[in-house]
């Protein structure tokens, strides 16, 4: 009852005033419930278009998840394929564009389902998705929130008490030295040159930990805090190196096939 009680008046007001509604949740089950509610509201002729965004990784049709045009056929000529098939127009005729619908279109037309859902969202009246798409500085929807003015939006935060912990995690990245050293050893023991390049990368990354440790040794009085400034330029350079290595690794994985259900390098990259 609370979902439709929040959505119905918001959608009605948005349609009357040319606004877009974002309904964000912390749980997939709540997103599914909201999408189901919208499907009932957005019957043919109601004049409402809605899209349910699934996580990018879960939407991927490849065995190995790495978004780069050089290794993903679903990203290659994406715009051309969408335009030639007039997919956006087709999808906007539906009351609700679900992840399953986008996946089906992606398979049939060899295009990225996630990008398709984002393009549909540009024209939709209601968007349902995770907190990430609004609040995560690393994955928020820049096409909607790049500007500082949000006068054209209505934001509904489902179970907002969950947002505190999520927000804290968004702005508190974690890097474990034990994990870095574990990957260093694993890569160094592989015979392939590419893995040795990864080992060199992890060796350099491991060298940053003493710098971070030394910067936290300043005595702090109870009730006060001390800022810790990581070597941002060094991390930025390593990030560029990792991007290059991951492209090569994605090509390698396409050639050799999946190694396991949970790839350690892939998990590290997206952590």
Spans of features found by a protein language model:
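Walker A/P-loop
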Residues: 1-9
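Alpha-helical scaffold elements adjacent to nucleotide-binding pockets in ATP/GTP-utilizing enzyme cores
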Residues: 9-10, 33-41, 52, 137, ...
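A substrate-engagement module of RecA-like helicase motors
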Residues: 15-127, 131-135, 189, 203, ...
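Short helix/loop capping segments that flank catalytic or ligand/cofactor-binding pockets
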Residues: 32-33, 61-62, 136-138, 143-145, ...
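Short basic/glycine-enriched coil/helix segment immediately N-terminal to the Walker B
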Residues: 115-127, 140-153
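Conserved Walker B
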Residues: 124, 131-133, 159-163, 167
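Conserved phosphoryl-transfer catalytic core
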Residues: 160-161, 165-232, 236
């Amino acid at each position: 009852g609370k979902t439709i009680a929040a959505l119905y008046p918001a959608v009605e007001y948005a349609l009357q005033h040319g606004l877009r509604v974002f309904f964000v949740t912390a749980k997939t089950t709540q997103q599914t419930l909201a999408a189901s509610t919208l499907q009932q509201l957005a019957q043919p002729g109601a004049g409402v278009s809605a899209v349910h965004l699934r996580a990018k990784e879960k939407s991927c049709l490849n065995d190995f998840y790495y978004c780069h045009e050089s290794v993903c056929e679903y990203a290659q000529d994406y715009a051309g394929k969408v335009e030639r098939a007039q997919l956006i127009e087709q999808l906007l005729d539906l009351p609700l564009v679900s992840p399953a619908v986008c996946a089906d279109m992606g398979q049939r037309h060899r295009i990225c389902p996630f990008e398709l859902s984002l393009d549909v969202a540009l024209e939709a009246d209601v968007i349902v998705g995770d907190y990430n798409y609004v609040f995560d500085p690393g994955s928020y929807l820049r096409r909607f929130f790049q500007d500082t003015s949000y006068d054209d939006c209505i934001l509904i935060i489902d179970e907002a008490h969950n947002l505190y912990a999520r927000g804290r995690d968004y702005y508190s990245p974690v890097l474990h030295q034990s994990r870095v050293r574990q990957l260093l050893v694993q890569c160094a023991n592989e015979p392939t040159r590419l893995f040795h390049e990864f080992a060199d990368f992890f060796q350099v990354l491991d060298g940053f930990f003493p710098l971070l440790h030394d910067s936290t040794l300043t005595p702090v009085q109870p009730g006060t805090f001390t800022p810790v400034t990581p070597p941002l330029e060094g991390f930025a350079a390593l990030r560029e190196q990792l991007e290059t290595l991951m492209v090569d690794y994605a090509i390698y994985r396409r050639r050799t096939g999946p190694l396991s259900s949970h790839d350690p390098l892939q998990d590290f990259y997206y952590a």
